[in-house]
């Protein structure tokens, strides 16, 4: 139906019907030539630029992907190094802690030894001082008892015991008798 409408609208030129939407042969040839020229210009100028832009974009995307993969690999290596360093640091901290604990125990043991030695030294010195004071007190007591005994014995006996040898013999005999009487009284 459409063809019939075109045929009715067209005029007949030299026995051929003309169609209004069909171009003339000259126009058709000029159109084909311009189409070929436009195609050639596009193929020579535009397409290479588009291809270059496409290639640049593809290379940039691939480069970015490679960079991202490389960065991820580096991050993984850094993470492994960090974990290794962290493990080393923990091991070092444990070693230092254990070393400090051992040093503390050693210092404590040394301090105990020093305190024990000081205690023994003080105890020994105190015992020596006490013994020296006891010996001195005993000597003073013997001398005092001897002097008193000599005075009393001299009064009782009526003779003078001023001679030191005699005095010493009397004192020793008196103390021996006194010790015997005390030991006899304590055994009862």
UniProtKB/Swiss-Prot annotation:
Record keyword Kinase present: no
InterPro entries, per database record: ATP_synth_B-like_membr_sf (IPR028987), ATP_synth_b/b'su_bac/chlpt (IPR002146), ATP_synth_F0_bsu_bac (IPR005864), ATP_synthase_B_chain (IPR050059)
UniProt keywords, alphabetically: ATP synthesis, Cell membrane, CF(0), Hydrogen ion transport, Ion transport, Membrane, Transmembrane, Transmembrane helix, Transport
Annotated TM spans: 21-41
Family: Belongs to the ATPase B chain family.
Assembly and oligomerization: F-type ATPases have 2 components, F(1) - the catalytic core - and F(0) - the membrane proton channel. F(1) has five subunits: alpha(3), beta(3), gamma(1), delta(1), epsilon(1). F(0) has three main subunits: a(1), b(2) and c(10-14). The alpha and beta chains form an alternating ring which encloses part of the gamma chain. F(1) is attached to F(0) by a central stalk formed by the gamma and epsilon chains, while a peripheral stalk is formed by the delta and b chains.
Name of this chain's protein: ATP synthase subunit b
Species of origin: Kineococcus radiotolerans (strain ATCC BAA-149 / DSM 14245 / SRS30216)
């Amino acid at each position: 139906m459409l063809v019939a409408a075109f045929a009715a609208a067209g005029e007949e030129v030299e026995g051929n019907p003309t169609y209004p939407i069909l171009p003339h042969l000259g126009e058709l040839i000029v159109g084909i030539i311009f189409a070929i020229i436009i195609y050639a210009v596009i193929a020579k100028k535009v397409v290479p630029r588009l291809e270059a832009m496409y290639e640049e974009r593809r290379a940039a995307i691939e480069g970015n992907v490679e960079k991202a993969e490389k960065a991820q690999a580096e991050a993984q290596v850094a993470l492994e190094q960090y974990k290794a360093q962290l493990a080393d640091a923990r091991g070092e901290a444990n070693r230092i802690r254990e070393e400090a604990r051992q040093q503390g125990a050693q210092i404590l043991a040394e301090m105990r030894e020093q305190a024990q030695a000081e205690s023994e030294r003080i105890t020994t010195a105190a015992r020596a001082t006490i013994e020296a004071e006891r010996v001195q007190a005993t000597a003073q007591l013997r001398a005092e008892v001897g002097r008193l005994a000599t005075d009393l014995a001299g009064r009782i006996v009526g003779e003078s015991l001023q001679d030191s040898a005699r005095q010493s013999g009397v004192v020793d005999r008196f103390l021996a008798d006194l010790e015997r009487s005390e030991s006899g009284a304590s055994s009862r």
